[in-house]
Amino acid sequence: MAYQVLVICVVSSIVFAYIVWRKERKKKLPPSPKGLPIIGHLHLVSPIPHQDFYKLSLRHGPIMQLFLGSVPCVVASTAEAAKEFLKTHEINFSNRPGQNVAVQFLTYVFGPYGPSVKFIKKLCMSELLGGRMLDQFLPVRQQETKKFIKRVLQKGIAGEAVDFGGEFMRLSNNIISRMTMNQTSSEDEKQAEEMRMLVADVAELMGTFNVSDFIWFLKPFDLQGFNKRIRKTRIRFDAVLDRIIKQREEERRNNKEIGGTRQFKDILDVLLDIGEDDSSEIKLTKENIKAFIMDIFVAGTDTSAATMEWAMAELINNPCVLEKARQEIDAVVGNSRIIEESDIVNLPYLQAIVRETLRIHPGGPLIVRESSKSVVVCGYEIPAKTRLFVNVWAIGRDPNHWENPFEFRPERFFENGQSQLDVRGQHYHFIPFGSGRRSCPGTSLALQIVHVNLAIMIQCFQWKFDNGNNKVDMEEKSGITLPRAHPIICVPVPRLNPFPVM
C-alpha cells in the first residue's frame, strides 16, 4: 500500500512539473541550468548554498532561476540585481518564506511582513535597540568586556590555549543576556549554558536543509527527524523563557505592591510594559515576547561572534594588516589603558578592517525573501511565491565593484570614494546587514560589540600557534550565519607590560 502511494505521488509530481514547465516556458523567465524531475536543481546545491549560487551565477548570469525541488527560486548575485529586488520592488519582496522553524518559534526575523513585524522594527529603532537604550547599557558592555579580557589574560598567564569562537560567543551571549533579561551568565552558569545551547540549536535548525520543505509530497513525512527536533527544542525553549518571564512578572508585582519601580529597565521590562498597555498599537502576548527574545539572541549572538572570529582569522593570515592596526591603536590609545568604545571613532583603519571582514565574510551570506505577487524584474517575469536569494557573499566578491575582491585589503575603503560606504544598506554592493524595511535593526549594537572587542584582541595580546606556520584555515561550514569550519585555537601572550589595571 505504501509503495502504491509513493508511486502515485512520484507520477503526480512528474505530471505537475511537466504542466508547470509547459506553462512557464511561454514566459520570459531568468536563465536557468538544466534540472532534473522532482528534485529540480537540488543536486547542484550543497549545504553551503551561497558558494554554489556564486559558481552557477558565473555561468548563468546575475539573475537566474532555480527549482529547489518544487519551490521556484530566483538568485540575485550582483549589486544592480539586488537593488532591483530590494529597492525598486521592495514591497513585493518584503515577505520571508514561512519555513517550519519560523512557524514553530513565531519569529519576527523569519516571519512574513505585516503589522507585527512593522511594529517590532519601529520599536527596535526607537526603544529596544535605539541610541538611548544602547547608551544606557554601555556599563553592561564595559563590564562584560572586562570579564572577557580577564578570562583571556588568565589563560595567557597559565599558557593555556583559547578557542576564539567559544570566547566570542560567550561574550556576545553575556551582553545580550544582560541587555535583554538583566542576567549575568557568571551568576547562573547552568542557566546561561542552557540558553547558549538553546540558541545554538535554534540557529542550527534554521540553517539546516530539510528536504520536506522543498519536495511537496514529502511534507507529511519527517524523513530527517527534523520536525521531531523542532518540537523537542521548542519544549526546551518554552521551559527556559517561561521560567524567566514568570520570575520577572513576580518581581514586577512585588515592586508594585510596595510602591516601588525598577530603576533599571531591560528589554524584557519594556516588552512587558507594552504587553500590559491596553492603548498599545499592537498587543504583545507572552508568545510574541518569547519570539522576540529568541530573535535577538539568535541574530545578535551568532553574527557578532562569527564576525569577530573571521576578523581575527584574517588578521592572523595577514600580519602586515595586524601590525598596521596595532600601530594605529598604540598611537591613539597608548599602552597605559585599554581601548574603549569612545576611541573607535578615532581609529579609521580598525573600522576599515571590520568593513573588509563584513565584505568577505558577511554575517548573513544570503538574504532570503519571497514574492507576494507576480512581477517583472529587469525584463524577467518572476511568479508569485518565488523564493528570492540575494547572494551577499557573491556581491562582496564582484570584480566590477571590488578590485582584487579575494584579497583582504582594508586600504580599499580609503580609495575611490569607498570611505563613504555605509554598512546600513544604502550602497547595494555592500549590504552585510541587509537593506530596506527588513534590514537588521541591531546593526549599531553589533558594530559596537565587534569594534571594541576586536581592538582589544589587537591591543592587548599576541598569539602563539602550535601548527608552526601561524596560518589558520579559512574553510566555511553550513549555517544560517557564516560559521567557520574549524575553530581558531591559540595561546594568548600578554602584550602590554605592565598590563593595565581593570
Curated annotation (Swiss-Prot):
Keywords: Heme, Iron, Membrane, Metal-binding, Monooxygenase, Oxidoreductase
Recorded family membership: Belongs to the cytochrome P450 family.
Family annotation (Pfam families): p450
Induction data: By methyl jasmonate (meJA).
Chief location bin: membrane
Residues noted as binding heme in the record, renumbered to the chain: C440
Cleaved signal peptide residues: none
Top-level lineage group: Eukaryota
Organism name: Glycine max
Localization in the cell: Membrane
Names of the cofactor(s): heme
Enzyme class: oxidoreductase
Residue intervals passing through the bilayer: none
Oxidoreductase among keywords: yes
InterPro entries referenced in this protein's UniProt entry, alphabetically: Cyt_P450, Cyt_P450_CS, Cyt_P450_E_grp-I, Cyt_P450_sf
A GO term, aspect molecular function: oxidoreductase activity, acting on paired donors, with incorporation or reduction of molecular oxygen, NAD(P)H as one donor, and incorporation of one atom of oxygen
EC number: 1.14.-.-
Protein name per the record: Cytochrome P450 93A2
GO cellular component terms listed in the entry, alphabetical order: membrane
